[in-house]
């Protein structure tokens, strides 16, 4: 490879990445997932479009694994351990039982549609059996879904790859060696994948945390150190026959949920690297496919994709979530619909090609076609489906910017900036009248681009920029304080006619609204009653019905229900109520 060739590669690579970024602006306008657009750019530039011939499967495998490791590390850093209280076991059930059921159901139909042996059909099912972390993290961001749904989908997508990889590799070995039966030793291999991956992921994350917090470096080097550490954990786990995907996700989880030096610098840098990883990975996968090869299999492949979306995934979700009573039908329906397939199935489809199996090219083309259908059908309809199934909750107003205050090594103090519009409730109020959350302070006030020296009597005006020092856990309270009038109206329409305190006694509530206790303990707090009705860990947006009224969890403080909204049937006149 001479200098001219290298320069051409740089030019083509930069043009493709730049084109992907520029064209991605069409994503929100057209309602098409950005990942589909990036795939399309790769396909257009490929052999049937721009004429770029790329058929190097080992290179695609290398790029895909590297990109997924970075994406999962970033996803782990942004996942809050607090979400595990509502989603850990359901997500693990989906990641194991759910993947196996999806594999079996998809494999049976694939074998019938394409006249393959049962074990070859099951291999196709295993390849497309897991949801994709890159697709899920990318498409769920900012959708305002309730915590139970969001946490379940994100944890599932970060932890179901070991099962899919295990099933794929096992079935490839069986086909290559001519085996037709399963053996109990396979269970031991699966436990080893999860065990080694979990142990090295948590242990590697803890070691990285100690290293980052104890060593003094230039600020820009900490994100690079974290990425390097994550890749060490990923590759070492794979070398020991564990799940590198699970390990790097857990490594990020540990780093993201402990006080760590240069936290915001790490998150900002990882955000850019994760985007670059997604763009590079989907460009390479788009270049790898030959579009005209998809046409002969389009009809049966579409049938298989729709079978997986409409039958296999929903049945696997219902079965996997059967023991978890907190999930109602709408949540199960939405989780079924967000069985997004992305880069992982395409990368797994490279395995049979590298192993030289018969019909390996068919497996690859099928995986690519199913991913394309999944992203187009499920990805584009995700916002509409969330509204239809009512799994969204009103989001808390967010600051226009936030930045870290590195007052000490593991400082968690942040500076939040709020712009006060005409519709803000606090316009016209003096600073001393604001009920600031405990532990927060107003640091500065800007008006007409000028820094003021405010006092307690300073009155807030439209257009003011308010800078507040606080912690991340103060954001919900600050969001309510600086909320907009339309936002408050949205809250009332969603949560009900009145909002009650969670510690209000059930007997008092029943007396005020003329409801019958039916043998319930009158001293029981309303929050405890709601928790029992939900049947599991509650989240904001959970609804239960009692005597024709709808009771909705409005705010939470950790595991505790703080406020409950109540909506009465149309045409009824409630009692005096407790409007708080």
From Swiss-Prot:
A GO term for molecular function: flavin adenine dinucleotide binding
Keyword ATP-binding in record: no
Gene3D superfamilies reported in the protein's UniProt record: 1.20.1530.20, 3.30.465.10, Regulator of K+ conductance, C-terminal domain (3.30.70.1450)
Domain RCK C-terminal: from-to ranges: 402-484
Subcellular location(s) per record: Cell inner membrane
InterPro entries assigned to the protein according to its UniProt record, in alphabetical order: Cation/H_exchanger_TM, FAD-bd_PCMH-like_sf, FAD-bd_PCMH_sub2, Na+/solute_symporter_sf, NhaP2, RCK_C, RCK_C_sf, Transptr-assoc_dom
Topology of this chain in the membrane: Multi-pass membrane protein
Pfam families reported for this sequence: CorC_HlyC, Na_H_Exchanger, TrkA_C
Keyword Ion transport found: yes
SUPFAM superfamilies per record: FAD-binding/transporter-associated domain-like, TrkA C-terminal domain-like
Source species, domain of life: Bacteria
Role this protein plays: K(+)/H(+) antiporter that extrudes potassium in exchange for external protons and maintains the internal concentration of potassium under toxic levels.
Recorded family membership: Belongs to the monovalent cation:proton antiporter 1 (CPA1) transporter (TC 2.A.36) family. NhaP2 subfamily.
PANTHER family tied to this protein: K(+)_H(+) ANTIPORTER NHAP2, NA(+)/H(+) ANTIPORTER 1
Name the UniProt record assigns to this protein: K(+)/H(+) antiporter NhaP2
Lineage: Bacteria, Pseudomonadati, Pseudomonadota, Gammaproteobacteria, Pseudomonadales
């Amino acid at each position: 490879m001479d200098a001219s060739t290298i320069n051409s590669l740089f030019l083509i690579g930069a043009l493709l990445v730049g084109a992907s970024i520029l064209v991605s602006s069409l994503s929100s306008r057209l309602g098409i997932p950005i990942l589909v657009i990036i795939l399309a750019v790769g396909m257009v530039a490929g052999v049937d479009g721009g004429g770029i011939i790329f058929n190097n499967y080992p290179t695609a495998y290398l790029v895909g694994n590297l990109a997924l490791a970075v994406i999962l590390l970033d996803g782990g850093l942004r996942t809050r351990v607090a979400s595990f209280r509502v989603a850990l076991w359901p997500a693990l059930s989906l990641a194991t039982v759910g993947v196996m059921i999806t594999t079996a159901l998809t494999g049976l139909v694939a074998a019938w549609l394409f006249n393959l042996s049962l074990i070859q059909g099951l291999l196709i099912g295993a390849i497309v059996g897991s949801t994709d972390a890159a697709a899920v993290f990318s498409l769920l961001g900012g959708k305002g879904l309730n915590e139970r749904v969001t946490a379940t989908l994100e944890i599932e997508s970060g932890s179901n790859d070991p099962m899919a990889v295990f099933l794929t590799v096992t079935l490839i070995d069986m086909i290559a060696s001519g085996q037709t039966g399963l053996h109990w030793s396979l269970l031991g291999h699966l436990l080893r994948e999860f065990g080694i991956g979990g142990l090295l992921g948590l242990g590697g994350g803890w070691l990285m945390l100690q290293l980052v917090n104890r060593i003094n470096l230039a600020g820009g080097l900490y994100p690079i150190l974290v990425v390097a550490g994550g890749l060490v954990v990923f590759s070492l786990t794979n070398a020991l026959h564990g799940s590198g995907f699970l390990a790097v996700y857990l490594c990020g989880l540990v780093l993201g949920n402990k006080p760590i030096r240069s936290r915001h610098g790490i998150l900002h840098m990882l955000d850019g690297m994760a985007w670059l990883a997604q763009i590079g990975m989907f460009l390479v996968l788009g270049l790898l496919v030959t579009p005209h090869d998809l046409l002969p299999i389009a009809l049966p492949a579409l049938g298989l994709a729709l079978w997986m979306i409409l039958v296999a995934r929903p049945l696997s979700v219902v079965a996997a979530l059967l023991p978890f009573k907190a999930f109602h039908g709408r949540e199960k329906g939405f989780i079924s619909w967000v069985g997004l397939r992305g880069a992982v199935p395409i990368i797994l489809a490279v395995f049979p090609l590298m192993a030289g199996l018969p019909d390996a090219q068919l497996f690859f083309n099928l995986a690519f076609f199913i991913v394309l259908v999944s992203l187009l059908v499920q990805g584009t309809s995700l916002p509409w489906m969330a509204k239809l199934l009512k799994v969204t909750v009103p989001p808390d107003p967010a600051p226009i910017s936030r930045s870290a205050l590195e007052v000490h090594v593991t400082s968690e103090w942040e500076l939040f900036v709020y712009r006060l519009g005409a519709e803000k409730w606090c316009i016209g109020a003096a600073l001393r009248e604001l009920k600031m959350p405990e532990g927060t302070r107003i640091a500065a006030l800007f008006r007409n681009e000028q820094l003021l020296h405010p006092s307690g009597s300073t009155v807030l005006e439209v257009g003011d920029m308010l800078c507040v020092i606080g912690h991340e856990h103060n954001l919900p309270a600050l969001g309510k304080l600086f909320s907009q009038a339309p936002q408050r109206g949205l809250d009332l329409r969603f949560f009900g006619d009145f909002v009650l305190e969670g510690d209000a006694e059930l007997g008092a509530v029943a007396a005020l609204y003329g409801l019958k206790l039916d043998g319930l303990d009158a001293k029981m707090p309303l929050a405890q009653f709601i928790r029992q009705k939900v049947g599991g860990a509650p989240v904001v947006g959970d609804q239960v019905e009692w005597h024709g009224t709808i009771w909705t969890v409005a705010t939470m403080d950790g595991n505790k229900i703080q406020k409950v909204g109540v909506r009465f049937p149309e045409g009824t006149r409630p009692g005096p109520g407790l409007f708080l």
